[in-house]
């Protein structure tokens, strides 16, 4: 498989892993309507523009917070105010809403599940680096 073909598969791999992450959160909090809303919104975005989520992840998560991700610092992500990170992004309010839809339940998880959530963040960042 050529390098170009491998790169074309990266967004699919990333999106599948991201969907798995959200599904795991849904499993822990099956009655949380906000998580289901985030899941549906991300699914819609993925169908409309499969590369959008990974590009946002690279620019706004993986690159600026590489050190915190590498350290596995879940508390950083749970407490951080992201509003200034998306000032230049035209849908910043929507992104902040989705972040909070996912972050709030993670904040309410036990340590073991928070560690799993952090592992997802680390894995997603590693996958994104391959693009």
Predicted regions and their residues:
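Terminal low-complexity "docking" segments
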Residues: 2-115, 129-130
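Short, hydrophobic/amphipathic alpha-helical patches that form generic packing surfaces
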Residues: 119-127
